[in-house]
Every structure is written in C-alpha cells, then in structure tokens.
C-alpha cells in the first residue's frame, strides 16, 4: 500500500526522479567545522530537550534511504565518507542520553536495494513505514553502545562496495 497512490512507485519511478551524474574523483572529508556543526545542532535541537525532560523517552530513527539515494546523493557527489562520519558522531551523541532510543534501518538491504519500496530516492511505501514501526515497537534495530560501531561498519562496507551500475541495468 502506498501513502501517495497518485504517484508512481517502483524502480522506473525512482530512476525518473534524478539524472545520474558521474562520480566525483575526490571525496569530501569530515572536517572539524562539520564536527562542530553536528555537535551544536544536536545539542541545541535534540539533546537539550532530552536532558530537560528526563521523564520522557524520545524515539529517533535513521530511515532506510534507497540505494539510489546512496548513489545520487553520496557516491556521485563524493559525500559518502563525510556522511558516514557525521552519522557515527550523531549516533554516539544521541546514545549518551539515556532517555533517547535510536533505531537505524540502512542495514535492511532487502528494503534499500528494492526500488519497488520507493517513489523517489528517499520516500518509502506505507508498508515499509509500518514495518519500521513494528520493529521499533519490538525494540528491534535499536542502536546501543555495544552495536553502534558494528552497524556503521556494516553499512559502510556494504554501500562502499555496492555495484551501483547494476541499478541501471
């Protein structure tokens, strides 16, 4: 089921939403300025609220962006390493707050690599959203201090080595 039935869904619909650009040869580093920006934004917009409300449990999640997003937004633009370092920093900071629960789904490769779940590079189907909520309710795919590095190592390896040309075959 799709939350936007008037829209086209699936591989062909996703591929129509962007023109694939050649990959940049240089990759953008995660700079100290990037680090400060992430830290300041998280502190101001998330962590301060969580700390001020210790009686509330906050739920956040990293959505399962499609393989086409990884290709068009990170790989082609040379932003992959920078994004992964930013994600890691964000996750570690969020996990410092004991009243924050962080879930992550970019390791659900059966979702991210199946463009039938998407209408563009980021918007997934209602069924996918329902599945994410079921997992969250069951406490599945929650990052912890013990799992965060394994999670990011796993997705970094997968997306860094994916055959992105196969999307277009």
Task: Report the location of each language-model feature.
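Acidic carboxylate-rich catalytic motifs and surrounding loops in phosphoryl-/glycosyl-chemistry enzymes
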Residues: 100-112
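Active-site segments of SGNH/GDSL-like serine hydrolases
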Residues: 50-76, 104-106
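Alpha-helix N-cap and loop-to-helix initiation/capping positions
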Residues: 34-37, 77-82, 124
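Histidine-centered active-site loop/cap adjacent to the catalytic His
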Residues: 117-162
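A cross-kingdom marker for long, charged
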Residues: 53, 103, 129-133
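Secreted/periplasmic serine-hydrolase-like ester/acetyl group-modifying domain
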Residues: 1-55, 151-169
């Amino acid at each position: 089921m799709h939350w936007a039935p008037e829209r086209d869904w699936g591989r062909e619909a996703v591929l129509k939403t962007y023109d694939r650009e050649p990959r940049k040869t240089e990759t953008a580093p995660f700079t100290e300025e990037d680090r400060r920006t992430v830290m300041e934004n998280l502190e101001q917009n998330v962590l301060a609220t969580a700390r001020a409300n210790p009686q509330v449990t906050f739920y956040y999640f990293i959505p399962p962006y499609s393989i086409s997003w990884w290709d068009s937004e990170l790989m082609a633009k040379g932003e992959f390493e920078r994004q992964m370092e930013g994600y890691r920093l964000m996750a570690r900071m969020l996990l410092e707050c004991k009243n924050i629960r962080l879930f992550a789904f970019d390791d659900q490769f059966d979702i991210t690599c199946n463009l039938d779940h998407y209408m563009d590079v980021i918007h997934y189907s209602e069924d996918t959203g329902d599945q994410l909520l079921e997992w969250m309710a069951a406490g599945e795919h929650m990052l912890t201090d013990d799992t965060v590095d394994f999670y990011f190592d796993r997705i970094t390896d997968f997306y860094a080595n994916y055959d992105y040309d196969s999307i277009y075959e």
